[in-house]
């Protein structure tokens, strides 16, 4: 189902388990990154399961930990959609500095019917903010109070800590493009 593919992707990326990527992506899949911020870097395109896994799991996992990504919508249970798009939010820490990163944007998925896997994922990163390690308790207290990995923008905004640095994220969630 669409839901299980999306869940397997987070098992791979958030939990640093590369073997899960083969349950989410077809061997010839394409990843496209649309960055609307300079705060994080990714190659604009990755072609094939190995390259996508390297970009989204192995290299990502070398740089970040405590990764919690949330889908801000949920596909119907037990359906196999040909495409699916939704907003997302992520919170994580930089291994090297302890700084906290919070970002948000949009996923646009395209799937093949058999075996049911993603053939394309476009990740748009609308904003990514960096907060000092001293804000980690407030940020992760907020994120860990959410239902993982499915929530909605209203719940995210309602529980957001009053940190000025989070304003761009909250603004996007209140007024997605």
Describe each model-derived feature in a short phrase.
Residues 27-88:
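A solvent-exposed, acidic/Ser-Thr-rich amphipathic alpha-helical stretch
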Residues 1-7, 11, 91-177:
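Terminal "cap-and-tail" regions of soluble proteins that handle hydrophobic small molecules
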Residues 24-25, 31, 52, 115, ...:
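Generic hydrophobic secondary-structure signal
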Residues 1-11, 15, 19, 23, ...:
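Short, low-complexity N-terminal intrinsically disordered segments enriched in polar/charged residues
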């Amino acid at each position: 189902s669409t839901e299980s593919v999306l869940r397997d992707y987070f098992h791979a990326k958030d939990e640093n388990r590369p073997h899960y990527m083969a349950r989410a992506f077809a061997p010839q899949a394409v990843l496209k990154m649309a960055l609307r911020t300079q705060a994080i870097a990714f190659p604009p395109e990755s072609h094939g399961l190995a390259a996508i896994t390297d970009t989204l799991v192995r290299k990502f996992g070398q740089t970040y930990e405590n990764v919690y990504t949330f889908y801000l919508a949920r596909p119907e249970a037990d359906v196999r959609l040909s495409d699916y798009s939704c907003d997302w939010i992520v919170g994580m820490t930089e291994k090297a500095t302890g700084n906290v990163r919070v970002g948000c944007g949009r996923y646009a998925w395209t799937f093949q019917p058999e075996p049911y896997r993603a053939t394309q994922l476009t990740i748009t990163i609308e904003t990514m903010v960096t907060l000092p390690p001293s804000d980690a308790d407030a940020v992760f207290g907020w994120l860990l109070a959410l239902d993982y990995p499915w929530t909605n923008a209203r719940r995210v905004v309602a529980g957001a800590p009053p940190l000025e640095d989070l304003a761009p994220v909250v603004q996007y969630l209140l007024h997605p493009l």
